[in-house]
Amino acid sequence: MSSIAYEQLYHLDVASLKAAADRWNDVARRYRQWGEGFGDGVVKPFDQAGWTSIDGTAVLARAQVAAAEKEFGDADTEAKGLRAVLEDAYEELRRYKADLHQLAADAPRNGVRISGTGEVSLIDPDEDGDQRRGPGGVIPSQNEETILRWQTRIALILTAAANADQSAAIALKHNTGKGGDEGFNDRTVKSVDQDESQRAALLLKKYERGDKLSPAELAELDRLMDHNQKDPEFSRMLLEDLGPEGTLRLAEDLEHERAGDGRDKDKYNSVQHALANTVATANRDKEFSDEWREDMRELGVRRTGDDGSRPYGYQTLTTLLKHGDTAGYPPRFTMGLTDDIIAAEKKHPDLWNEYDQANAGADVDPVPVMDPVDDMLGIMSRDPDTATAYLDPGDDGGNERLKYLLDQRDWPDLEVREVYRGQEPTGTVDHIDASNTRVGLGSVLEAATTGEEPGPPHTAGQARIMRDTVGLLDTPPGHEEIQPNLRRPLANCLADYTDDTHEILSGVQGSYTHEAPQEHGRGGDGLFGRENDAHMSPGSDKLIRLMRGVSEDPEAYGTMHKAETAYIAKQMEDTGGTTADSVREPVRKGGAALGAYDAVREDVVYDKRDDANAQEDWKAKTVYHVAGTPVTMVPGIGDAAQRILDAWTYDVSNEEKGYNNDAAAAEVADRSLQSQREMQFLVDEWANGPGMPGMDDPDVNDLQLDMRNDHTTGEKLANDAIGR
């Protein structure tokens, strides 16, 4: 591909392109006028003369007159095509020139100088920012990173401009036709997009037929797709040319390239990425999307080939879509397509299952399944606002998507038919959870309940989803089971709502324990607050049982515990007081909340009582994650709270580092994570801070006693909830 230098684009005379396009408009008008004159002055008189001849001379003459008349029309068509291409080139290059000028204007305000030839330097470089980082200095310095960032922005604009220039040049060449005896071109394209979509479609169809693309053809295809993947007109025309079935066959072939190790794998992966974006871009148009999805409703439940092992259309489509820039997909498309797939699986149960057979008593390992619904949920998780809109039950509870996914859906699995001696079926069929089951669901739940930024405030929609998730996943005491792939995402969700879970577990905040009016529906029903500052308040028993199920994963438990500790430290700091009485409420609430964590942790350990290694492994991993988890879900932590939290984290990690086996680390967990010891440590750190009364103050000692009483209350509350 040809390149454009910085100074060429910066000083490009785009007005000349506009003037050229306007002149071609004049040319087209003149050809039309000449054609009309030829028709009036030659064609009509010739036809009116009624000339006939035996030797065919009249027929030949009439054909020549008609050919001449057609040339005037073709000349008009060619001129219009050239004008259209020049107008497209003008619009694109004008935009890229403006982008470059804006970048140059922004640079000085950011301490960056861009020379007339595009060289980037810092106006006043920070001497401390010159040090390269990482082992052996392999990571660029901060100053180098700044320069690289601006160089990259310039390069992206220049590359896009060069693409536009090359695209226009090729389209102009196509529009002029072959010339010579063939005359003017009557098959011109009406835009650069049309020309490029036709060329891309030809190359893609050639590849899909199994014909090998030459290096030049593959490079051109990669350029065409990369340059146009976010262009609505190109995308619609390309998909219309390929057709829905052709698109699916192509998507399957490209996925095979990804799984292989061919020499051109990276280029085909780039084409696959662009094709995914092209599908999403085309579906921004409502009329196109409605028709395209209608076709997919039929193709989605059919296999993409005659082979019974080939995937279904929806499986192929969602696999393709995962490889695009999913965060930018249009919400109407992602939500609508997900609903289409759910409607299909309700009509065709077990459509996405995998099947196998095994001898009686043989162990069968879980395998991944191609679950298009879960794929789409994972895609939506990249756009938190869309995730929330999709799952929000609404003020009236009318949206039941969350209920379907958490409570009603028969998730695809591995169906294993038992056989005797490898042949005779025994009649026994086992269902084994897929290794990747609910991965997308976990991601979309986390996005939908937490939003873009960690921690509160939460919107009413986010809080509704969190509240209903707690309720829908509730189980009877003693049966707190959460599917493994949901545990960490749910722990992240709960950690994000620590301001709510803390109050619920402490059981003393009236807004969480009594009906409270609210402005966005169903007042007091597990939800209160304002539209953009809402709180979930499910029953403490349901919350505790969910925490217990999630805590089977030690990392999940560590995430929640660390968030709770950070929140307690923040609450102590937020009082602004310097006496024991000033922090009494946060300390007592903290004791109660951590008492509940004690009960949860002890129940997990108790359930592993028959396997000492499993107990030790869980404890060791828990203390590791509690000590190592960064606190991002509790915003607004000040210096005093951070000091308290850092001291406790250092104490835990210091003890943990002193042991080199799981058994010893488990002892650290028993000691360090026991909530009475933890709260005592936090209170002592607070009391020993600047201007504080000191840990030996009698009032501080009384506060520690109150905390222990509340710890017992919180622990009992949790034990009752989980049936201990």
Language-model-derived ranges and their functions:
Residues 1-177, 212, 723-724:
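N-terminal secretion-targeting helices of virulence/extracellular proteins
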Residues 181-721:
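Non-catalytic all-alpha helical scaffold/repeat segments
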